[in-house]
Amino acid sequence: MSSSQNNNSSWIDWFLGIKGNQFLCRVPTDYVQDTFNQMGLEYFSEILDVILKPVIDSSSGLLYGDEKKWYGMIHARYIRSERGLIAMHRKYMRGDFGSCPNISCDRQNTLPVGVSAVWGKSTVKIHCPRCKSNFHPKSDTQLDGAMFGPSFPDIFFSMLPNLTSPLDDPRT
């Protein structure tokens, strides 16, 4: 973390600004602080202090090393909430996650997906709702797939009924 970084920015601001992390959406502070959303996550009180306070020099020894995992697991929960789905919907409609490389899908927008909900099993993939295939993203991202989970695309389309899933397109 650079010392020239704005002192009012948090670890979250810094983390979301890293190249390759553009698939992630900002999890609001109130969601992060809600103890219900932290259930089952280890060391949440210590890590919560780090990710919400203004960024400090990482050489100070106040970073635990699990911040990325902790934020990723909170993110996976958040994107299943109403507010999280709205944030991901905006990114989907803008094409932030890329498009399907399959020519027959006609550059269909994709969604991020993890092949496992277990941390450390695989990096994030992109899922095409038209051909139902998963692909490696073109962007330079090494995000863990657990930050999205294997069911995110299904949840996304089932919770946003105003979207017609390309799977329902009679032309396919």
Swiss-Prot record:
<protein>
    <recommendedName>
        <fullName>Stellate orphon protein at 12D</fullName>
    </recommendedName>
</protein>
<comment type="function">
    <text>Unknown. In males lacking the Y chromosome, its strong overexpression leads to the appearance of proteinaceous star-shaped crystals in the primary spermatocytes causing meiotic drive, possibly by interfering with normal casein kinase 2 activity.</text>
</comment>
<dbReference type="GO" id="GO:0019887">
    <property type="term" value="F:protein kinase regulator activity"/>
</dbReference>
<dbReference type="InterPro" id="IPR016149">
    <property type="entry name" value="Casein_kin_II_reg-sub_N"/>
</dbReference>
<dbReference type="GO" id="GO:0005737">
    <property type="term" value="C:cytoplasm"/>
</dbReference>
<dbReference type="Pfam" id="PF01214">
    <property type="entry name" value="CK_II_beta"/>
</dbReference>
<comment type="subunit">
    <text>Interacts in vitro with the casein kinase 2 alpha subunit (CkII-alpha). The relevance of such interaction is however unclear in vivo.</text>
</comment>
<dbReference type="InterPro" id="IPR035991">
    <property type="entry name" value="Casein_kinase_II_beta-like"/>
</dbReference>
<dbReference type="InterPro" id="IPR000704">
    <property type="entry name" value="Casein_kinase_II_reg-sub"/>
</dbReference>
<comment type="similarity">
    <text>Belongs to the casein kinase 2 subunit beta family.</text>
</comment>
<dbReference type="GO" id="GO:0005956">
    <property type="term" value="C:protein kinase CK2 complex"/>
</dbReference>
